[in-house]
Amino acid sequence: MNLSIMVQGTASDVGKSVLVAGLCRIFMQDGYRCAPFKSQNMALNSGITPQGEEMGRAQIFQAEAAGIAPDVRMNPVLLKPTSDRKAQVVLMGKVACNMDAVEYHQYKPQLQQQISEVYHSLAREYDVMVLEGAGSPAEINLRDRDIVNMGMAEMADAPVLLVADIDRGGVFASIYGTLALLHPHEKARVKGVIINKFRGDIALLTPGLEQIEALTNVPVLGVMPWLDIDLEDEDGVALQNGKYQDTAEKALDIAVIRLPHIANFTDFNALAAQPDVRLRYVSQLSALGQPDLIILPGSKNTLGDLQWLHHSGLAAALLTLHQRNVPVIGICGGYQMLGKRIIDGVESGLEQMDGLGLLDVETEFAPDKVTTRVSGYCQIGLPGILKNCCDHPLEGYEIHMGVSHLGSAAIPFAQLTLRNGQAEQWVDGAVNGDGSVLGSYIHGLFDSHHFTRALLDSLRQRKGLAAFDGVTVNYAEHKQQQFDILASQMREHIDIDRILKLMKQHQQERAQ
């Protein structure tokens, strides 16, 4: 029988995903075989397993923290919003259907048995399971069909840690209120509280800690300081909170258009980590400025976001800046927008729409989603900003429902050689004649650090700057360093020994 612990929160964005990653890292460092698990994730940031199955990026980076390959069983249900009212339902890595909130709430009981079986199948292979909840367990309107918070804790018979964010204010009320709204048997599962994102003198907080412990009869097991670490976010809340608004002056200014249905903005973390890059997300025309590069990211509603791009004035501004020699890159949905036309009977209900016309490409959406990990290299002889990138290795993954057809004026961007680890030859993406526009389906493209540095040095050259002579960040290594920093901070500020002790005690009680 394995050990387990579940991390729940008083609200969304309190830091559950990061703390789960930290616990996974700690248990891995201490010699345990550990795996993360989240029964249901709602996010547009997703990734692909080595088997070509789609799952939430939060569980992927948690698996990386644990030193294991991502497994779709770690996130059996993924909800990807397609509009304010509907979401695509991905079950065990494959698209099942689209549902609105009412339909999905009615569907949840059918998922419960499958989720339980998947969890226990995974748990049998590991010493420690670290589970993550979603939002808050005190959503009393959803309690009767809960499959992700206390409902999941009961399925796994796992003790619970409750995380609260002090930075947003009202931390003691959020702790007390959450525990007060739980049923007695649910509250009994909560073995400790962690206060997250603290800034200031801990001595000023101590009286409050003593009072909340007395009021709730639940111990506070740690107070985590605000950490300036670079780890991926599972959804767009971080964008809304301005986490990625870099204001420092740096050699290169890169503007990512923040589309209403932006997907996989983690694609650009590797760019933001480079010491000579200022990366910012732009949703208003007045904020676009004069960047050195514009990026159109992926989208879960490509035509809807293309309409928004026109209505916001950003489409016209992008075209004007391109005429003034500002290069443009599109990833996935952004790539499709850069073409001449998009034909769609799948995502938006709109039949077709003209693209921005910067690439000689037409895209037709299809009901079957492509989900695959890919490897290859940048084509030889590409012009413009890609002239220094030729033959550099590329790795990443594709998640899309469209097929793009290149016209005679488009140059293929990449020669791909591996699909989900199997040898295969095909081309990806498109480049215009002067190499000022690139479109690609490869998510995670900028994680390929040799390609990224060559691209950035081309941008520097266009500005009359010398090639960068500092240390280029290898993003894969950078993430591993961030996991170690996180684990070290958690060991310092959280009573990890006590958490492990309560996990073992709970295991013994289960065995009786």
UniProtKB/Swiss-Prot annotation:
**Pathway noted in the entry:** Cofactor biosynthesis; adenosylcobalamin biosynthesis
Transferase is among the record's keywords: no
Keywords associated with the record: Cobalamin biosynthesis, Glutamine amidotransferase
Domain called GATase cobBQ-type: residue spans:
251-451
Listed SUPFAM superfamilies? Class I glutamine amidotransferase-like, P-loop containing nucleoside triphosphate hydrolases
Q: Which Pfam families match?
A: CbiA, GATase_3
Record keyword Lyase present: no
Q: Which residues form the active site?
A: C332, H443
Q: Which domain of life is it from?
A: Bacteria
Gene Ontology BP, a term: cobalamin biosynthetic process
GO MF, one example? ABC-type vitamin B12 transporter activity
Which HAMAP family does the record match to this protein?
Answer: CobQ
What family does the Swiss-Prot or TrEMBL record give for this protein?
Belongs to the CobB/CobQ family. CobQ subfamily.
Main role?
Answer: Catalyzes amidations at positions B, D, E, and G on adenosylcobyrinic A,C-diamide. NH(2) groups are provided by glutamine, and one molecule of ATP is hydrogenolyzed for each amidation.
Instruction: Tell me the NCBIfam families matching this sequence.
Output: cobQ (TIGR00313), PRK00784.1 (NF001989)
Please report the name of this protein according to its UniProt entry: Cobyric acid synthase
